[in-house]
């Protein structure tokens, strides 16, 4: 039955793609489309099928979830439509120089920044894991600037998203299937894009070999007030005609120069003899008359950036937060505080610690999970956690469990010391993209023995699969 269901789903997706290719004239109107799709490049039509398939499904489910997820999805959709406009341009024009290419990529780059900024501005969102999954992977749209391996770049971004989509699945798999479908739809965008790149743009964005050199995107998304503005000013007067006499003089001088060169050794007959009294190293008086020697040109050095005369405005300091919001303890923007304590905890509560610097925090009682995000020099002591303690985007963090914790996750962190209790020796340490990690195990005397977490690995192909082992470094 499961095989039959999978077959039906594959057939439905195939039909959807065929319909997209056949009826793309009704889609994405105003984003580089011509009235007729008969002349559209094949890889543009296939990209349209991606928009009509996984992207449309992702937008549909995001709309059903609503809120921040829907707003985020609309931003992603805009980025994909900008990318489609670039594909249309590439199919019709030749590749421009690098400095001009960066101008063509600027709209996509700005849209990527907007998607990432939205996540940063909504850290208190209940759907923060959804926003993080999108924010961590949206840079996959930059594959158009990646050569010679754009496909692996997209896969890397997709893998980054899975760190957060796994958390969405864990949270909603038994609660709301809609969020599970959302994860499948979103990740399928990037897996389908990888297959698309492999077929049409294996070593980089494929540009036309004919046509004009690309200067601007063909059919950028038009805003609602696109037609209300005044017409652009007329072009300025043409530059004055270049004098032809200078060109003829230059040509004549060049001819004379070649004529002299062609004389060969006889050219030296026109040289004058220089006697000793005309040489500065033989006649000191002549050297004194000529004044100080001019120094040669200085070697090239990169221009130093000009310093602004006006002082830079001070960075706005965010207010410190320590409060219970629903079931979430928020500890944010704490600096140089050494006595923070959370006491009234419950099993269903979670703690989110964000942008705390040189601060120590103690969490008493039993809590569901703890997340440490973007913190520096943080000391965290807690009793019991039934879920996971996660440290991400941080540095020089020390955590100590007094009771029990099943899992400690360390991601994108440089410097982490995890002090385990005797009751938590079976704790799993999961790490990724991190360094300088140490686990400290208690001894009978009350001290701790320090054990570094491996950071270097060796992977070999054994004929059937990849086998990865820790690399021991003798120091």
Swiss-Prot record:
Keywords assigned: Acetylation, Actin-binding, Cell membrane, Isopeptide bond, Membrane, Methylation, Phosphoprotein, Ubl conjugation
Positions of the C-CAP/cofactor C-like domain: 313-453
Residues modified to Phosphothreonine: 307
Location within or outside the cell: Cell membrane
Compositional bias (Low complexity): 218-228, 243-255
BP GO terms, sorted: actin filament organization; cAMP-mediated signaling; cell morphogenesis
One GO term describing the cellular component: plasma membrane
Compositionally biased intervals (Pro residues): 229-242
Keyword Phosphoprotein attached: yes
Modification N6-acetyllysine occurs at: 81
Highest taxon in the source lineage: Eukaryota
Topology versus the membrane: Peripheral membrane protein
Gene Ontology MF terms in the entry: actin binding; adenylate cyclase binding
Residues with N-acetylalanine modification: 2
Chain positions of cross-link Glycyl lysine isopeptide (Lys-Gly) (interchain with G-Cter in SUMO1): 348
N6-methyllysine: modified positions: 287
PTM annotation (Phosphotyrosine): residues: 31
Region (Disordered): 216-255, 278-318
Modified residues (Phosphoserine): 34, 290, 295, 301, 308, 310
PROSITE patterns membership: C_CAP_COFACTOR_C, CAP_1, CAP_2
Function: Directly regulates filament dynamics and has been implicated in a number of complex developmental and morphological processes, including mRNA localization and the establishment of cell polarity.
UniProt family annotation: Belongs to the CAP family.
Quaternary structure and interacting proteins, as annotated: Homodimer. Binds actin monomers.
Protein's recorded name: Adenylyl cyclase-associated protein 1
Organism: Pongo abelii
Annotated gene: CAP1
């Amino acid at each position: 039955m499961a095989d039959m269901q999978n077959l039906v789903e594959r057939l439905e997706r195939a039909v959807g793609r065929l319909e997209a290719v056949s009826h793309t004239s009704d889609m994405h109107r105003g984003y580089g489309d011509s009235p007729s799709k008969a002349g559209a490049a094949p890889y543009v039509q296939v990209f349209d099928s991606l928009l009509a398939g996984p992207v449309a499904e992702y937008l549909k489910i995001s709309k059903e979830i609503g809120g921040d997820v829907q707003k985020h999805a609309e931003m992603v959709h805009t980025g994909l439509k900008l990318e489609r406009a670039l594909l249309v341009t590439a199919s019709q024009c030749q590749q421009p120089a690098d400095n001009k290419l960066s101008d063509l990529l600027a709209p996509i780059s700005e849209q990527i920044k907007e998607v990432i900024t939205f996540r940063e501005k909504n850290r208190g969102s209940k759907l923060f894991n959804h926003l993080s999954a999108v924010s961590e992977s949206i840079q996959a749209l930059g594959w158009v600037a990646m050569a010679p391996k754009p496909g692996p770049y997209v896969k890397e971004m997709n893998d980054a998203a899975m760190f957060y989509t796994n958390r969405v699945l864990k949270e909603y798999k038994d609660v709301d299937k809609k969020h599970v479908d959302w994860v499948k739809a979103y990740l399928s965008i990037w897996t389908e894009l990888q297959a698309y790149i492999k077929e049409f743009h294996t070593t980089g964005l494929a540009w036309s070999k004919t046509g004009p050199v690309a200067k601007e995107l063909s059919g950028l998304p038009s805003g609602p007030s696109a037609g209300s503005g005044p017409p652009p000013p007329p072009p300025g007067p043409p530059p004055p005609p270049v004098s032809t006499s200078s060109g003829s003089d230059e040509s004549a001088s060049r001819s004379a120069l070649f004529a002299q060169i062609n004389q060969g050794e006889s050219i030296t007959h026109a040289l004058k003899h220089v006697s000793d009294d005309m040489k500065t190293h033989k006649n000191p008086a002549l050297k004194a008359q000529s004044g100080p020697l001019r120094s040669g040109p200085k070697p090239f050095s990169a221009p130093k950036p000009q310093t602004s005369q006006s002082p830079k405005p001070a960075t706005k300091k965010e207010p410190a937060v320590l409060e219970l919001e629903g079931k979430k303890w928020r500890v944010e923007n704490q600096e140089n505080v050494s006595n923070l304590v959370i006491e009234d905890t419950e099993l269903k509560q979670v703690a989110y610690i964000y942008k705390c610097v040189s601060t120590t925090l103690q969490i008493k009682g039993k809590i569901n999970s703890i997340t440490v995000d973007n913190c520096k020099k943080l000391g965290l002591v807690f009793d019991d956690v039934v879920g996971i303690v996660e440290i991400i985007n941080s540095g020089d963090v020390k955590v100590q469990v007094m009771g029990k914790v099943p899992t400690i996750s360390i991601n994108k962190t440089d410097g982490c010391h995890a002090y385990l209790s005797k009751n938590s020796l079976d704790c799993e340490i999961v790490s990724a993209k991190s360094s300088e990690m140490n686990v400290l195990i208690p001894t009978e005397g009350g001290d701790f023995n320090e054990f570094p977490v491996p950071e270097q690995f060796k992977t070999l192909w054994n004929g059937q699969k990849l086998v990865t082992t820790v690399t021991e470094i003798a120091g």
